Amino acid sequence: MEGFKLIKVLFATSEANPFIKTGGLGDVMGALPKELKRKGIDARVILPKYSAIKGELLDKLSFKKWFMVPVGWRNQYCGVYQCEYDEVIYYLLDSEFYFHRNGLYGEGDDGERFAFFDRAVLETLKEIDWCPDIIHCNDWQTGMIPVLHKLEYSKDPFYKNIKTVTSIHNLLFQGNFSADVLPELFGYDYEPVRNGSLEFYGGMSFMKGAINYSDRILTVSETYAKEIKTPYFGENLDGLLRERGYALKGIVNGIDYDEFNPSKDSLIAKNFSVKTIEDKVLNKLALQKELGLPINPDIPMISIVSRLTNQKGCDLIVNIANRLLQRNVQLVILGTGDYNYENHFKGLQELYPTKVSANIKFDNGLAHRIYASSDIFLMPSLFEPCGLGQLIALRYGAIPIVRETGGLKDTIHSYNKYTGIGNGFSFTNYNHNDLMHVIELALETYDDKEIWRSLIIQAMDSDNSWNKSAEKYKELYEELIK
């Protein structure tokens, strides 16, 4: 087509499903590029080649080339591997020194590891002779790519016309390090700290660099984009985000409808759809048997699939647990996190063995079965940039109870008993009594089977696929490269 330009986008990320993931970022990086590819964008992904990547995926990789990457005063080996998965090209950057570790994050040299990765991403482009129109960075781990590009690489004609975008998936994690990182790892003097563009409370911040130097800043929901411009949610970067508000936009995440599809999901006991909702209860019966809970199709099953942390509202749940368990309910928990919460939920199982199943682990198959079996899904987060759990719950007909924050506010529409419209229940104040009140309202509604069926239909009919969101990303890219 005359005048048609294929937009080339490189997603730089520290994790991507199916190769490796620790949370929502990995899910997004596995699904969004695939959807953009369907919309005619040449979307590719670059990430570290961690030793934890599964063997069957490693077997798909082909070695392209190697080169040395300057990290301050020294040079480090970088190998480039490539594979195609779901029609998307992935580049994995190999460095045994930096990425052959037990975990992805939390190492003492994380600053150096991702300083290497960020420069290696830019160096790789010239080495493989592929120049994207846009480098789309994600969270602090790729935050120095826009900085390196603006201060250094844009002077090279090869890189000159590249635009940079950064998505903030969670502003809480910022990549804050000593200011000595600049000369030690990037070969710069202290000027970016002195002029304030990277300075953060006496040190330097990868995230602040990304916010200052990216051409566009995105968050993963419209409400979170507004929230992070306020002191309560802004994590000491709210002033800068207000200043750069003209470049800030929120686009809500979707979920991968290929992976989360109750009508085809091989991980659940009985497939069902919005047309065969009556089959959903067979999953509940199978899960009750699997977890050793009393088998009863009528008892409301309430679930939590989450990291067990304050951010996820676990303190509220702990406060109401005994009151909740006086009722005729079953509570199923899956997740790991804060040691105190893990112990508390294990203690609840000992205290209420016929009502509580506490699974302190991560198990993807069990997560699917819990979503498919649950009647109610709890997600009372203190803050939630987007949240994927509530979207998966909707897909499987588990009615979410959420706090109105971030992406939860954007995706869950509280049930109105007068109009009959809604796909979940919500509350505003971060208060355990308010949470208990809305759970009681949901349980009261559950007793009316006709209304509850209508709620399930509205939940399952909610469109939370990547289709709409990917269209908004495409529009942003088109506007950026005009």
Curated annotation (Swiss-Prot):
GO BP terms: glycogen biosynthetic process
Pathway, per record: Glycan biosynthesis; glycogen biosynthesis
Organism of origin: Clostridium perfringens (strain 13 / Type A)
SUPFAM superfamilies for this protein: UDP-Glycosyltransferase/glycogen phosphorylase
CDD domains: GT5_Glycogen_synthase_DULL1-like
Encoding gene (name): glgA
Protein name: Glycogen synthase
EC category: transferase
Function of the molecule: Synthesizes alpha-1,4-glucan chains using ADP-glucose.
